[in-house]
Regions:
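Extended, low-hydrophobicity, polar/charged segments
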Residues: 1-165
């Protein structure tokens, strides 16, 4: 009888290669359909403040930047630009995401992109014992220490979200 092999993503393999402890999690989704982050948190039974979405932007200088913020938050483009020393930044179009990062919309992770871009985490990540980020594929998340994650991607922390209304 064949053993059932647990599916691993490139993100999980990268974490193992670097010796970074993590816990894998899966959640239900439609075929090729990316649920919003709050739904992911609900499906995993965790506080949405622990689940971070990965957003990729392009600065006025032409440089690319990655921002990881809580799933219920909205990126403040002015604060984000200031955090990376740009005059302005804009969200990357979905069609540009896969060729640039190797990830699809809804499965983008700060870990294991084709090229490592400057990465900024919302400062609230540091208040959590663990955070969840995409494991590089829709339906998969990894839970790990924010300090380990920031060290791995050489990330910084700043207030880059819009004020809650």
């Amino acid at each position: 009888m064949a053993k059932h092999k647990e599916e691993k993503t490139n993100v999980m393999r990268a974490l193992e290669q670097k010796g970074v402890p993590y816990t894998p999690h899966t959640y239900p989704h439609g075929d090729g359909e990316a649920p919003d982050g709050v739904t992911v948190a609900q499906n995993l039974g965790i506080n949405p403040a622990q689940v971070f979405k990965t957003l990729v932007t392009k600065g006025a200088s032409g440089g690319y930047y990655v921002f990881d913020i809580p799933v219920a938050a909205t990126l403040d483009l002015k604060k984000a630009a200031k955090a990376v020393g740009e005059k302005s930044i804009a969200m990357l179009h979905s069609k540009e995401l896969l060729p640039l990062t190797g990830y699809v919309h809804g499965g983008c992770s700060p870990i294991g992109m084709k090229k490592q871009f400057p990465t900024v985490f919302h400062h609230s990540a540091l208040d959590q014992e663990t955070i969840f980020v995409s494991a590089g594929k829709i339906g998969f998340q990894v839970e790990l220490s924010p300090a380990d994650l920031m060290k791995l991607v050489r990330g910084t922390a700043a207030d880059v979200t819009a004020a809650a209304e």
